[in-house]
Amino acid sequence: MSYSLRIADLPEDERPREKLLKYGAKHLGNAELIAILLATGQGKGKLSAVGLGQYILQQLGQNRQDPMDVLRNIHPQELIAFPGIGPAKATTILAAVELGKRVFQSRPLEKMVVDSPEAAAIALSQDLMWQTQEHFAIVMLDVKNRLLATKVITIGTATETLIHPREIFREVIKQGATRLIVAHNHPSGGLEPSPEDIRLTEFLLQGAQYLQIPVLDHLILGHGKHQSLRQCTDLWERFPQGD
């Protein structure tokens, strides 16, 4: 596809809007999705809307960055700096990005059963998934793993958060929960548990054994992904929770 060719001059099955209607949004590339938001390119003889979308992604992807990660938190003036992008197009893109975040984060909480890392990640996505600071939160459950409440316990720096097990179990007992899942985010998007993450989990599992309030998992969240320490470590074999 020529990125200077007007979308109106493309074969119908190559036009972003027509492709979306015929095949669904998931079949469009990122540049094509941006093109739909832009509606127009830079003008006659210059980049089409698809070409401009591709150019934006290329520029955002400099220095080996993921352009979608950059776009997730981009400032309006950064978009307006691109030739062919004015306030109207910039705000349309930013509104779409924000709407996507909210759709991802939205979930029905009442009577939600949290019986997997995926379900726990959904329950905590609004509090943890896209934060630029490190947050530590807990999911409190009843005996049937039904969600009672979620709570952010601490907000730390971008690299660490300070938490003591007693703060966690105090809140769990206060809510009348019988089991819990703990979680924190890595603002970098990396999901590898740090030595501090492992040590804190050990302390929590030991405290849970003493209080007979099982800790079902410790999740790390970031940039739309999650990691379960129960699945990637042997901590629950070393400190059984009786769950």
Swiss-Prot record:
Keyword line: Hydrolase, Metal-binding, Metalloprotease, Protease, Zinc
PROSITE patterns according to UniProt: MPN, UPF0758
Record GO biological process: proteolysis
The keyword Hydrolase appears for this protein: yes
Motif JAMM motif boundaries: 184-197
Molecular function terms, GO-annotated: metal ion binding; metallopeptidase activity
Pfam families in alphabetical order: RadC (PF04002), UPF0758_N (PF20582)
Sequence similarity: Belongs to the UPF0758 family.
Protein name: UPF0758 protein sll0766
Lineage: Bacteria, Bacillati, Cyanobacteriota, Cyanophyceae, Synechococcales
